[in-house]
Swiss-Prot record:
Belongs to the bacillales FliT family. The gene is fliT. This is Flagellar protein FliT. GO terms for cellular component: cytosol. It comes from Bacillus subtilis (strain 168). May act as an export chaperone for the filament capping protein FliD. It is found in: Cytoplasm, Cytosol.
Amino acid sequence: MNNIDQLYTETKSMLSHIQNTPESDELLKQIEDFVATRSELIQEISLPLSEEERKQMKLILTWDQLIVKEMERLKQSIATELQQMKRKRVMHTTYLNPYNNITIDGTYYDKRK
């Protein structure tokens, strides 16, 4: 199996895996492994490509665009999770110590005359 065939199978399996698996730490680890393997395979590709290899490369490039979109979706979901965690942390500390963030600006309004 040559490098383009390996790249083809790796990309195809990664696309199906990233689309069908919910976000998790394991998925992120697999994405890192995929990117490392993929970069090695791309470095080993030698350039006069046959017609079949060109077709495979075109398909790999279209799949790559889909993988990038899925990775952007994962990035957005991770960012929203982080924002939610920060909000929960702020609400939790506010609940534990409600008088912590009171500002004292020296203003006192007397209602009596």
